[in-house]
Structures are given as C-alpha cells and as structure tokens.
C-alpha cells in the first residue's frame, strides 16, 4: 500500500526557524538532563565518602561538588539559589562530621 498522506487539517504549519528552535531545544534538553545527572552522581559520591569517614576523599569530593554546581550555574542549568542550597547542605554535612 502507498504511504498515507497526512491530513492537512491536523498538521501544524511552522516556519523553518521555528522547526530549528524545536530541534535545538530538544538537543539542549538532553544535554541539560545529562549534566543534572552528573551533578546528582557527584553529590551521591560525596555523601558516600562522608559515611566512610574518609576525610581526604570527603574534602576532595566537596571540591568537585562545588565545581560541578558552579559550572551548572554558568551554563544556566541551575539558578544561583539552587546552587547555593546544594553547596550549603554539603558544607553543613562536612562541618557536622568535623565537630
């Protein structure tokens, strides 16, 4: 059978620039999602090092948490306040372990 032609009433007409923006938004969504996942992974790694009471690894992981969260803000993935909350929680956990 021949392929079915789309019904013109159901097709949304878009300008080429709008089509490009849709594709670009989809690409950015994938990139942003993977970066958010990376942040979550690093935070979990930091929390795991806290449970092991490994001071050197904890401080190293704290620096990586700070770094990756700041990069997320720079890229526009996180807002400033969300980054501040994540960093504050991490620092509070380290200080609670130290005392």
Curated annotation (Swiss-Prot):
Taken from the record, one Pfam family name reads: Ribosomal_S20p
Q: Does the keyword rRNA-binding apply?
A: yes
Q: By its UniProt entry, which InterPro entries does this protein fall under?
A: Ribosomal_bS20, Ribosomal_bS20_sf
Question: Which SUPFAM superfamilies does the entry mention?
Answer: Ribosomal protein S20
- List GO molecular-function terms, semicolon-separated: small ribosomal subunit rRNA binding; structural constituent of ribosome
Gene3D superfamilies registered for this protein in UniProt: Ribosomal protein S20 (1.20.58.110)
Q: Which GO terms describe its cellular component?
A: cytosol; small ribosomal subunit
Instruction: Mention one GO biological process in which this protein takes part, according to its record.
Output: translation
Q: Which UniProt keywords apply?
A: Ribonucleoprotein, Ribosomal protein, RNA-binding, rRNA-binding
Its domain of life? Bacteria
Q: Which family is annotated?
A: Belongs to the bacterial ribosomal protein bS20 family.
* Function comment: Binds directly to 16S ribosomal RNA.
Q: Which PANTHER family match?
A: 30S RIBOSOMAL PROTEIN S20, SMALL RIBOSOMAL SUBUNIT PROTEIN BS20C
Matching entries from NCBIfam families are given as: S20
Identify this protein by name: Small ribosomal subunit protein bS20
**Naturally occurring in which organism (per UniProt):** Chlamydia pneumoniae (Chlamydophila pneumoniae)
């Amino acid at each position: 059978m021949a392929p079915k032609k789309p019904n013109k009433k159901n097709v949304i007409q878009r300008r080429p620039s709008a089509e490009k923006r849709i594709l670009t938004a989809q690409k950015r969504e994938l990139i942003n999602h993977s970066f958010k996942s990376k942040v979550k992974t690093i935070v979990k790694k930091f929390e795991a090092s806290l449970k092991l009471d490994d001071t050197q690894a904890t401080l190293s992981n704290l620096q990586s948490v700070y770094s990756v969260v700041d990069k997320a803000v720079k890229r526009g993935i996180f807002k400033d306040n969300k980054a501040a909350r994540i960093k504050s929680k991490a620092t509070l956990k380290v200080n609670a372990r130290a005392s």
